[in-house]
Structures are given as C-alpha cells and as structure tokens.
Amino acid sequence: MAQNVTLYNLLISCPGDIKKEVTLIEAAVDEFNELYTETLGITIKTRHWSKSSYAQSGGKPQALLNEQFVNKCDAAVAIFWTRFGTPTDEYGSGTEEEIEIMLQSGKQVFMYFSDKPIPPSKINGDGYEKIQAFRDKYKDKGIYFTYSSDEEFKKMFFAHLSMHFLTEKRVSETAK
C-alpha cells in the first residue's frame, strides 16, 4: 500500500581516514528507517561524495559537490580522527566547508571527534594540529562529542539521530 513519507537527506562529511564510521552511520540510519518509516512516516537517506556525486567539469571540486548534493541536505554528520582533509579555496578542508555551509543555513550538524587509538604509521602531526584547532573553535558552542570505540560511536550517533529527527517530526506535527 502506498504511503506518504517525509524524506530527510543526511550528509556524511569526513576526511578519507573515516571508513568504519561511515559504515556505522549507514547501519544506524538503516535501523532508524526500519523503526520509524512505517510507524511515523519519516525516512533518512544518507548522502556521501562516494555515492552521491558524479563526474562534472566547469568548476572547483568542492563547489561542484556542494551544488550536486551538499546544499540539498537537511542535516549533516561530521567526523574527524587523524586527518583534517583536503583544503578548498575557502576553508581548511572540504569537511570544514560542508560543516560551515550547514551551520550557516541553520541546519543540524552532528559533529564527532574520534579518540580511538592511532597506529603510529597513521599519525599526521599537521593534520592532528588542524583538527585540534578546529575542535577548539567549537568547544564553547557545545556542538560536538568525542568517542573512544566504534560501538560507543554507533550508540551515541543513533541516540542523537533519533532525538533530533523525532523532535523534528513532533515540531512539524504541532505546526500543522
């Protein structure tokens, strides 16, 4: 039977060292959709450069990604671990630019910093310093969390995702 569903686009924004967390985000979103799509009529679609972009010319890479899908997202989840990312014309990394676009648009950003152990071969001093400076920039704004394990991240993210989108659903219903 056909059903009306409100679709939210969730941007996954992270440097290339974040791989396991992308899988965990996808799993958390799948779990959310399984629980709430039929009962509440809301669903979330994840958007990530690896699956939501296409080859395009005629502009700067990050600007093209922003136009293709970033600007169309309703919320974002951003994660940092050992790398800050590739600089853009405007920001220290594409991830930083995506976060700023979302925040300037008044959209929800779930921001996380990994405190998982780092193998010595993955340590990038310059990248780590940039991450710490970025983290310090937001420390008084209360918009990020840290985690020390994959399981902790998945539980925390699922809880935050659920609280936000269930609140969105309640607010939209009371506005009717």
Residue ranges and their predicted role:
Residues 1-176:
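Conserved catalytic or regulatory cores that recognize and/or transform ribose-phosphate-containing ligands
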